[in-house]
Amino acid sequence: METIAFRMVLNPGQSEEYRRRHREIWPELVETLREAGIRDYWIFLDDATNHLFAVLKRERDHRMDQLVTDDVMRKWWGFMSDIMATGSDGAPAQKPLVPMFYLP
């Protein structure tokens, strides 16, 4: 398993809506993420900057790169696009984070 982290940006005033939508996450999206090899997925909010920090584990043979063409994933991204920054492909704008320290 590999651990990765990335940053996204939430629109101001949307933290409760973001939380609500994730409380009601679609079962088919959960299945899609798991089938892509994603495990132990956390998203944290820095409410001073509206930055979301995601940390997840992925299997060595993950298929995260294929999520961009998955219908369920694209539908979710469209559903979330009104409350967060997105890229030209409709996916949330993401900035990979560089590991700086690890305590096993």
UniProtKB/Swiss-Prot annotation:
Gene3D superfamilies: 3.30.70.100. It is found in: Cytoplasm. One of its GO terms (biological process) is rhamnose catabolic process. Homodimer. It catalyses: alpha-L-rhamnose = beta-L-rhamnose. Substrate binds at Y18, Y41, W76, W77. The lineage of its organism: Bacteria, Pseudomonadati, Pseudomonadota, Betaproteobacteria, Burkholderiales. It comes from Burkholderia ambifaria (strain MC40-6). This is L-rhamnose mutarotase. It is an enzyme of class 5 (isomerase).
